[in-house]
Each structure stands twice: as C-alpha cells, then as structure tokens.
C-alpha cells in the first residue's frame, strides 16, 4: 500500500482508506470519508461462510466476483483480547484489543472470468476462542489500491 502511494514511509498507527494514507483517522473527517465510500455501489461481489467442523477447527469459504486482475484478501480475526503490558510507556496497564488478525490469506487472484472460490480448514490455536472470531474479506485493485468491496462476518454460534 505504501508503494502504491509512491511513499517509503511506514509508521504506526497508520491507517489506509481506500488505498490512500489517511492521517486524520482520529477526526470526524474519517467517519465522513467512510460514509461517503459506503454510499457508493460496490464494484465486486463477495460472500463468506464460517462454520465449525470440529471442536477446534473452522471451515472458511470465500467466493468473489470482480474484474480480472483484482485480488481478494481474507482475514480471520478475534475480538475481546487483553494484554498486560510489562515494559515501555504503557507498563502496568491492561490493554484491550478488537479485530486482531489471527490468520491472513491473499492475494487470491480472480480467474480470467473474474471469479475466485477459496476454502480452507483452520485449526484453532489453543488460546483462540471461536465465539470471539470472525472473518473479513476485501477485493482490491492491485494497481490503484482501491477497495472494490469489503465485508465482515462475525461468528454466530446460533
């Protein structure tokens, strides 16, 4: 993403919005920019499924359609994590984390008809909690960084 913006600078926390560096992510302008993007029609189509296959394994399926050349990315995330900080500026604090990426997949390439179907069995590490997990996926134009569609599927233990 940094290279697509003709930059060599990576910093934390760095937020990219639709393939562009967005330094004002802590301001109201970020919410407005996200809202504007969300009002636009998607230029790709993505579906996700997430289901248990046994007590410590999840079945993940992603289907997507977009123009040829577009890349699909899928991430398995976990919410409601905590860490006790032992050193540095936050020493002694208990930090809370959501949307922590546990597994990252991609780029998955569309075929010449602009389709991709991808399936995987994910064995959960002992410290992961399936009920706190979910999937996100996005289709991205690799030449411009533009996000053509993005979706999130939280775990539903229904």
What kind of region is each of these model predictions?
Residues 1-158:
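Short, conserved sequence motifs used for protein processing/export or organelle targeting and
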């Amino acid at each position: 993403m940094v290279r697509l913006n003709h930059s060599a600078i990576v910093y934390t926390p760095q937020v990219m919005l639709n393939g562009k560096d967005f330094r004002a992510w802590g301001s109201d302008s970020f919410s407005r920019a996200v809202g504007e993007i969300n009002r636009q029609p998607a230029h790709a189509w993505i579906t996700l499924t997430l289901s248990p296959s046994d007590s410590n394994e999840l079945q993940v399926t992603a289907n997507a359609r977009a123009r040829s050349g577009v890349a699909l990315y899928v991430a398995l995330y976990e919410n409601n994590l905590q860490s006790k900080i032992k050193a540095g500026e936050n020493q002694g604090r208990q930090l809370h984390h959501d949307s922590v990426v546990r597994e990252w997949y991609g780029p998955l390439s569309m075929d010449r008809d602009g389709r991709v179907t991808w399936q995987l069995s994910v064995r959960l590490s002992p410290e992961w909690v399936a009920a706190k997990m979910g999937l996100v996926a996005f289709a991205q134009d690799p030449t411009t960084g533009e996000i053509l569609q993005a979706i999130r599927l939280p775990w539903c233990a229904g």
